Design a protein with these regions (language model features):
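Low-acidity, Ser/Thr- and Arg-rich intrinsically disordered low-complexity segments
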Residues: 4-16, 22-24
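Basic, often amphipathic N-terminal segments
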Residues: 28-139, 152, 156-238, 251-265
Length: 265
């Protein structure tokens, strides 16, 4: 139960959004990587599904940041890459190796971290673990692990978390809305941005474990081949998501693990 005091906001789409003639396709993985400055007076928290074991270790090495341990990791020199990993995964590395369930947010009213943790812990006690078969994809101009098959259970889990935690979320500032480039979103995505602070929620949700920035076609093909070799035999089949984790952004915008809540339903 939410115990902090928050004022409820309207969930209707804002009239300031103007639809472009041809909205661009969803780029939800890169949308997580658009923060350029961090306001120390508005701590940001996110709820992630985080890989474990050698898959997580490989991902931390690729990105150069271990969000579980809260430390930088030496990125390997991988022959064949067109650029160093430090450039290919520059912004993605801030967030760690993860799949977003509830996008980074500030907390509303007098809500504090304990309220978020307790609410997620209670929620996870009622949610079931889910299994996802992953494949390496590059069809949205960046490289990411994404589901290879049906995701109905995963969609339900993510939607439940987004809805149940949203009363804790502070309303987006004008600057945050502008950063999302709402003119490039579909009308439905604009509505979700206003309602949940993120345009790729509910039916627009698409799980992704991001590896790179957006890349040109020729680079993307090369990097994909190198990544396939690097992650070979390290990707769980399937990936069992049996806990959800809260991460907090530091003053540099890097995310650190705070708590993990097991799915016990």
């Amino acid at each position: 139960m939410i115990i902090c005091n928050v004022s409820r906001r309207s969930v209707s789409a804002s009239p300031r959004f103007k639809e472009t003639e041809r909205p661009r396709p969803p780029m939800n993985a890169t949308a997580d990587c658009q923060t350029t400055t961090v306001d120390p007076h508005r701590p940001r928290y996110a709820v992630y599904a985080m890989p474990a074991g050698e898959f997580a270790d490989a991902g931390a090495a690729w990105l150069g940041w271990d969000a579980r341990a809260g430390r930088q990791v030496a990125q390997p020199h991988l022959p064949g890459l067109p650029r160093p990993l430090s450039q290919l995964a520059l912004r993605a590395g801030r967030y760690g190796f993860h799949a977003t369930i509830k996008a980074p947010m500030a907390l509303a009213g007098d809500c504090g971290y304990d309220d978020l943790r307790d609410q997620l812990r209670d929620l996870c006690g009622r949610l079931h673990p889910v299994e996802v078969t992953l494949e390496l994809r590059d069809d949205l101009n960046f490289l990411a692990f994404r589901p290879a098959g049906g995701t109905g259970d995963l969609q339900d889990l993510a939607a439940t978390v987004v809805r149940d935690l949203d009363p804790l979320r502070a309303e987006l500032t004008e600057r945050e809305i502008t950063r999302r480039n709402p003119g490039a979103l579909t009308p439905r995505q604009q509505g979700l941005l206003v309602q949940f602070g993120y345009p790729y929620a509910l039916e627009e949700f698409n799980l992704h474990v991001t590896l790179t920035e957006q890349l040109a076609d020729d680079e993307r093909r090369i990097v994909r081949g190198v990544a396939e070799d690097f992650f070979a035999a390290k990707v769980p089949a399937p990936w069992r998501i049996d806990e959800l984790c809260i991460l907090a952004a530091d003053a540099q915008g890097r995310f650190h693990l705070r708590d993990c809540c097991p799915l016990k339903g």
